[in-house]
Amino acid sequence: MEKVLFLDSPMKEKPYGSMRIQEKFGFGLMDKKIGEYWVISAHDNGLSKIKNGKYKGETLKDVYLNHRELFANDPHDKFPLLVKINEIQEPCSVQVHPDDAYARKYENDYGKAEFCLWLDVEEGTKIIRGHSAKTKEEFRKAIEEKAWDTLFVRKLVHANEFVYTPAGTVHGIEGKLMMAEVQQSSDVTYRIYDYERKDANGNMRELHIDQAIEVTNIPHVEPDVHPIVTMLEGNEVIEYVNEKYFSVTRYKIQNEIHINNPSYSLCLPLSGNGILDIDGKEYDIQAGIGFIITSHTKRYFIKGNIDLLVSVPK
């Protein structure tokens, strides 16, 4: 009866990446520009493997499919969430994600709603958040005319701020930052604008204008989300979102804390280190190494100095 699953997870080379993820979390350096670290993933495009216990060496995908009792008998046919750390050193594409209905029909995948927490942010960094178009025709016309300055809405961001991005929301990043991301387990992205970058062979990445126009929320609607800050056993607790697909809560642990586990929890230590205690059995935990508290655990105890991001699927 496994109560916690520690994970060994893939890193993704991206044109906007760097070495900072590897440096920040003490991983071995690779001669690659890492833009995404899929900390907790059962998606076919990047599978986490179990590091401990009876399922050691198996993929999270297989364990989820074959041992649903570890995951509160979750009814989703595929593991529902994907947890990442992303590093942006150049503007990333302006993009939009479809909802479940569209993604299932055309991509055989989940749609994508996502939560992003900005960790390290260079001064002056902006995100693209929404657009100015009022109709699909106006949206298409602005794209055809490359009216990027007036079409896209930009906003300055700072460390420890967050955004919740429902499917259909146009978004992008201009500047340099590192972020933690919790999203539906989907790799479907429709690119609208990629800054006309070319790869080593002189080719530009594919754009998906027709699909983007089809799935974008027009006019843009900003979700109404507000964090709830409380104290638990002397530690600050921030519930960022509690939405349709997941909740995301941050525990800034300074000493020790007991945390209830309502079903199963996806845990990403953002910084620091500590001890995880489940029914008297102790495990070392450290920044950057993701783990899952299975539904066989009803409550867990953490001691140390550690900043922990916990997401719970719905």
Where are these regions (language model features)?
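Acidic/His-leaning functional-site neighborhoods
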Residues: H226-Y283, A287
